[in-house]
UniProtKB/Swiss-Prot annotation:
EC number(s) per entry: 2.5.1.n9
Intrachain disulfide bonds: none
Biological process annotations from GO: glycerophospholipid biosynthetic process
Keyword Electron transport among record annotations: no
Named cofactor requirement(s): Mg(2+)
Organism the protein comes from: Lysinibacillus sphaericus (strain C3-41)
Primary enzyme class: transferase
Subunit structure of this chain's protein: Homodimer.
Role description: Prenyltransferase that catalyzes in vivo the transfer of the heptaprenyl moiety of heptaprenyl pyrophosphate (HepPP; 35 carbon atoms) to the C3 hydroxyl of sn-glycerol-1-phosphate (G1P), producing heptaprenylglyceryl phosphate (HepGP). This reaction is an ether-bond-formation step in the biosynthesis of archaea-type G1P-based membrane lipids found in Bacillales.
Protein name (record): Heptaprenylglyceryl phosphate synthase
GO MF: heptaprenylglyceryl phosphate synthase activity; magnesium ion binding
Length: 229
């Protein structure tokens, strides 16, 4: 399945433990893809471990790159975030330049997906690490979405609330502005009801932390998203 058609994504953190039994339930849940990525302590060993374990199942697997040292072949897609609301050029284009300089000769460009991130939780680790300006109005956020689609021509715009449940009005407003760029939503989903609500607006709903806190609740989000038109 092409990433443009994904509705539901389970995000696994390579720095967190997950049992084989729980991983099997995640991989056979009906989710569209397993997205591997994290902020802290992302290592090549962790990325390889999840790749090998998930490859036993039919579900596609993608890697969201946060550090050059943890890049490995074998994933179906490689998601490359550029943090549009960061004040640090490192997270907008410098790391990307370094990665292309090192791996450009062997990159399969059709496997790379550039995503414009807008981080909206001021207290999350990724906001602190990237120096993101999170005190944004809806107009600010919509402007970033327009910039992602019309200026940078990015295929994905990612609203990242990272640990807190976001504002559906913001997600709806952004979706109404995007015509070609796909809207990913991630952050704070702990129930099927929340997943269903965000699926009304976002093209793709990403479910992460709840996997490690309440697996049953996480699994229930798949049907909730898939049944939302």
């Amino acid at each position: 399945m092409d990433y443009l058609e994904w509705r539901h994504v389970f995000r696994l953190d390579p720095a967190k433990d997950i049992s084989d039994e729980d991983l099997e339930k995640i991989c056979e849940s009906g989710t569209d893809v397993i997205l591997v990525g994290g902020t802290d302590n992302v290592t090549l060993d962790g990325v390889l471990d999840l790749l090998v374990r998930v490859r036993r199942f039919e579900v596609p697997i993608a890697l969201e790159i946060s550090t050059i040292d943890a890049i490995t072949p074998g994933y179906d897609y490689y998601f490359i975030p550029t943090v549009l609301n960061s004040d640090d050029p490192k997270w907008i284009k410098n790391l990307h330049h370094a990665a292309i300089k090192e791996f450009g000769d062997i990159m399969v460009w059709d496997e790379l997906v550039a995503e414009g991130y807008c981080i909206l939780n001021p207290d999350c680790k990724v906001a602190h690490v990237t120096g993101a300006t999170t005190d944004l109005s809806i107009d600010d956020i919509v402007a970033y979405a327009r910039m992602a689609e019309n200026f940078f021509k990015l295929p994905v715009f990612y609203l990242e609330y990272s640990g807190i449940y976001g504002n559906p009005e913001v997600v709806s407003a952004v979706k109404n502005e995007l015509k070609h760029t796909k809207l990913f939503y991630g952050g704070g989903i702990t129930s099927a009801k929340q997943a269903e609500e965000m699926a009304q607006y976002a093209d793709t709903v990403v479910v992460g932390n709840i996997i490690y806190e309440d697996l049953k609740a996480a699994l229930a989000t798949v049907k909730a998203v898939k049944n939302t038109l």
